[in-house]
Each structure stands twice: as C-alpha cells, then as structure tokens.
C-alpha cells in the first residue's frame, strides 16, 4: 500500500488570505474569509468553470477550508476532467490510485495519469520521478517505465535509456511485464547476453513469450552457449501456451532429432497446431510429412491438400521448384518420383478439359506399385460420366480395392455413394457412417466435416451438437473446414450450442475459414512440368 502523499494539482486564482496573528479575534475573520472563498469557488464551479471545479476538488480532498470529503472531491475532479482539465484528470488518477472516494483501481489510475501527461502535464512526470528518487514507489516506477517505454504524446518521447532505468527497478520488484520489456529493448538492440536474464526471470514466472525467447536463445546460441535440450524444455512450455513460433521451433527440433530424440509424430502434432494458427510454413511441413509418410501413414491426396493450402498462402514457388528438381544426391526434389507422377496425373484430371486417358496410364503405373490412392483416382476417372469410358463397376472396384488398403480418400468417396445411392450401389446409412469414420481416422479432414454435419443435423445418426463440434474442431486441426461445416460451427458459437460459450468474434472468424471445393484445383491448373528424363 502506498504511504507517500502525492501533490494535488491546482491553479485557481483565488483571493490570497493575509496571515494574521493567531489570536481569538482573528479566527472568526479567517473562517469567514474561507467560507466566502469556498462559496465563490462553488458558484464558479457550478457554472462550469473547470479551474474552480479542480481547485474545489483539491480543497475537499485535503480538507483545506472545508471538511475533508473524498467523494465530493472526486465529483469535482470528474466534472473538470470531462472538460479536459489536465490537472483534474491527474487528480482523478490519484483518487483511483489510493482508493479515495472510489474503489482502488491501479489500472484506471495509470490510464488517467497517462491521459493527463499526454495532454501536456509534464509536472506530473517530474513529481513522480522525484517520488521514486525519495521513496522507490513501486507504482511510480511502473508508471515511469511505461511512459518512457511507449512514449506519451508530445510530452514524453520514447526513451529506451530511461525506460531501462525504471524497467530494471520494476523487474527487481518482480514485475513480469517490466522484465519482458527490458529484455525486449535489449533484444531489439541485439544485446542478447543482457536480454537473456530478464527473459529467464519472466519465463520463471510462466510468461509464454519469454519461455519461447529463452528457447530461441538457447537453440541458436544468442547470448549463451547452444543447448538444444534446454531449448526444447523452454519451447515445450511455450508451445503448450499456444505460442506458434515455439510450436514451429520445437517441431523442427523433433523432426530433425536435433539435440533431442527424433519424434515425427510429436513434430507433426506441433506443426498442425501452428498450421491451425495460419502459419504457412507449418502448413507446408505437414504436407511434406504426409508425402513422405513421416509420423503418419503416407498419403499423397492429404499431402496435396496441405501443400496446396500452403501454396495459396504464399508457398507456390516452393512447390513449383521442388516439382521439377531432381531427387538425387543432396537434392530433395520430386522430379521422376511417385509423388511427381501422382501430381502429373492429377493435373490431367483437374484440367478444365480433363484428359482421363492420359491420367489412367500414369495412375496404372502407380497402382502396380501398390500405392492405394492411385486406385482411388482410377475410380474417380471412371466415375466421370463425361468420359466416354466411364464405368460404374470399374469405379466401385477401384474404390473398394483402395478402401481395403485403408485409403481415406476412397472411404470418403464410398461414403458419398452410399449416402446418395447409384446404379452401382444401393444407399446404405450404416455404411455411410462407417466409411466416413474410416476416412476420418485416416486424417482426411473433409470426412470429419461430413461426420460433423451428420451429427449437427441429425441425418442418419442421432443429433449430437457436442459431437459435431468435436469433429469440426478436428477438421480445423487437420487443415480443412468446408463451408457448411464452418457455418454450422459458427452458429454454435453464435448461439452457445453444444456446450460452447457464446462468442460472436470466434463465430465470425470461423465463418471465414469455410472453403468450397479442393484447394488443389487452383494449384494444379497453375503449375508447369519440365519434360521427364
């Protein structure tokens, strides 16, 4: 609790009182003069004179010439402050700081002090600096650290040197925010050795960004020796607090086994979490891991889904470069690989004028290598009735073959067929759910969306909004949310359905995430292939 009495600000030009000899006869005259002055002040204050209002407030605050009354003091300060009286605003801040006439509120006090300073009250800054020099007031240390760190209008310019002076004092008083700010100033100046102790101090108190920065420093040898194991420990804490950069950095360490044990599955989990926060590199990394079968079962369709999304977020050049770069020696290009052939075949299928005959030739080669998704795509070729060789029996045979090999895309397509029914297959509600579930378990996000839609609407299955939300969230984590799924999930947050709290902002953000169709169509129509060797 603050014990330092702060100076009240007043500037009203009231009639000065002559000093009198303290005798019995002088007292009534002095009291009478005070009463006259207070009455004049009150009349002026009631007429809206902000100087009079502020001065009257100081009288009631201090008990000068009137009986002390904090409530009345605050009333007059407030009236003057509404007229932008700079010193009255500061005096209101004092009331909030000390809890005089109102409940103590340090945040509001700082807000009012900064408003007063910004409006030109340099005297307040000087007063607080003097107070710190005399009494080491924690409140004033934090206030001064804040205004010098951020600047405060034209009255106080941003000053890192003075900011550091007060931030260090505040950090010594266990202010996490001050420690982070001091570290940030040093970090921006690339004075890493000076920054690290402050980041460590804040990290020790659980500050997520500081935990990430400690991990970054230890990982990259900034201001300290490289220690990947210690870095990973810090990064893990920050990642669990949803810091995307920490997720990425820890994911990279786990992916490479750099200083810690390699773990593709954990790396994948972290990349997906970062991808859900729209980190394009994380989106790309997930796609690469599906392409390579690292930490997950290899699946070219899911890989392409992720890579196409990354391409739409600015990484198309990466895709194009690797597509035509050879996979030899130290180069990790895709040219003449199975994935290259898969993408090549897909371009013929996704063209504005599909060439299924050419696609089938390429896919048949892949199918002979037991690449399940090739069977699925062959089925898709025969499913298109615009092709003269369309054949529903062949379509079903290929889908079922791929589904037996646990290809999620095949199960997804089968679920759609069982839902609608066709000449090749009868509608079967039970098989719809089973196939969607298999596709979902295989990581195919559109299947998760469809399951969510079923539980949201109560079609085929018993309506269960909570279960629908779980599928939608899982779909988001797996890189895709259909327009219908996004609208349904948004409505849950808009109305507070399925156990989620009403949140209009979250609803709005989710609605924006909805996608129509496949992201890969635009990518496949915009890439070029060099001639095969």
Model-flagged regions — what are they?
Residues 22-24, 127, 131, 320-340, ...:
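Terminal, low-structured helical/coil segments at or just beyond the last alpha-helical repeat
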Residues 12-38, 43, 106, 334, ...:
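Sec-dependent signal peptide cleavage junction
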Residues 46-49, 62-64, 82-85, 98-100, ...:
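Short helix-capping/linker turns of helical repeat alpha-solenoids
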Residues 104-121, 298-315, 473-475, 487, ...:
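TPR/TPR-like (Sel1-like) alpha-helical repeat modules
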């Amino acid at each position: 609790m603050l014990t330092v009495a702060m100076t009240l600000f007043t500037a009203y030009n009231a009639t000065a009182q002559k000093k009198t000899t303290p005798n019995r006869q002088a007292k009534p005259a002095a009291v009478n003069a005070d009463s006259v002055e207070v009455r004049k002040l009150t009349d002026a204050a009631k007429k809206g004179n902000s100087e009079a209002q502020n001065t009257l407030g100081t009288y009631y605050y201090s008990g000068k010439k009137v009986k002390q009354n904090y409530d009345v003091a605050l009333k007059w300060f407030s009236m003057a402050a509404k007229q932008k009286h700079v010193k009255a605003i500061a005096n209101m801040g004092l009331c909030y700081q000390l809890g005089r006439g109102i409940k103590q509120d340090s945040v509001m006090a700082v807000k009012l002090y900064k408003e007063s300073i910004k409006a030109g009250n340099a005297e307040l800054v000087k007063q607080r600096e003097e107070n710190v020099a005399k009494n080491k007031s924690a409140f004033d240390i934090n206030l001064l650290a804040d205004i010098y760190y951020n600047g405060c209008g034209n009255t106080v310019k941003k000053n890192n040197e003075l900011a550091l002076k007060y931030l260090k004092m505040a950090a010594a008083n266990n202010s996490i925010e001050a420690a982070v700010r001091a570290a940030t100033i040093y970090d921006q100046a690339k004075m890493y050795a000076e920054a690290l102790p402050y980041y460590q101090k804040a990290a020790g108190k659980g500050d997520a960004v500081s935990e990430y920065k400690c991990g970054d420093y230890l990982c990259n040898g900034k201001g300290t020796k490289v220690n990947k194991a210690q870095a990973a420990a810090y990064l893990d804490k920050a990642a669990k607090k949803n810091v995307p950069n920490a997720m990425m950095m820890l994911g990279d360490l786990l992916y490479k086994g750099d200083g810690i044990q390699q773990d593709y599955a954990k790396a994948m989990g972290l990349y997906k979490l970062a991808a859900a926060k729209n980190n394009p590199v994380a989106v790309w990394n997930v796609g690469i891991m599906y392409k390579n079968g690292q930490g997950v079962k290899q699946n070219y369709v899911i890989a392409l889904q992720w890579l196409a999304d990354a391409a739409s977020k600015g990484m198309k050049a990466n895709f194009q470069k690797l597509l035509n770069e050879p996979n030899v020696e130290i180069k990790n290009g895709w040219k003449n690989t199975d994935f290259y052939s898969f993408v090549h075949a897909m371009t013929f299928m996704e063209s504005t004028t599909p060439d299924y005959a050419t696609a089938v030739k390429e896919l048949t080669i892949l199918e002979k290598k037991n690449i399940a998704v090739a069977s699925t795509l062959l089925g898709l070729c025969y499913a298109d009735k615009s092709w003269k060789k369309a054949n529903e029996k062949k379509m079903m045979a290929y889908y079922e073959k791929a589904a037996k090999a646990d290809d999620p895309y095949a199960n997804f397509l089968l679920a759609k067929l069982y839902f609608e029914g066709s000449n090749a297959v009868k509608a079967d509600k039970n098989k719809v759910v089973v196939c969607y579930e298999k596709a979902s378990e295989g990581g195919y996000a559109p299947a998760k969306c469809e399951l969510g839609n079923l539980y949201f609407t109560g079609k085929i299955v018993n309506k269960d909004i909570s279960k629908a939300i779980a599928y939608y969230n899982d779909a988001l984590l797996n890189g895709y949310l259909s327009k219908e799924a996004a609208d349904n999930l948004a409505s849950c947050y808009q109305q507070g359905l399925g156990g989620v709290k009403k949140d209009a902002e979250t609803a709005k953000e989710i609605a924006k995430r909805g996608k129509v169709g496949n992201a890969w169509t635009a990518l496949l129509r915009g890439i070029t292939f060099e001639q095969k060797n």
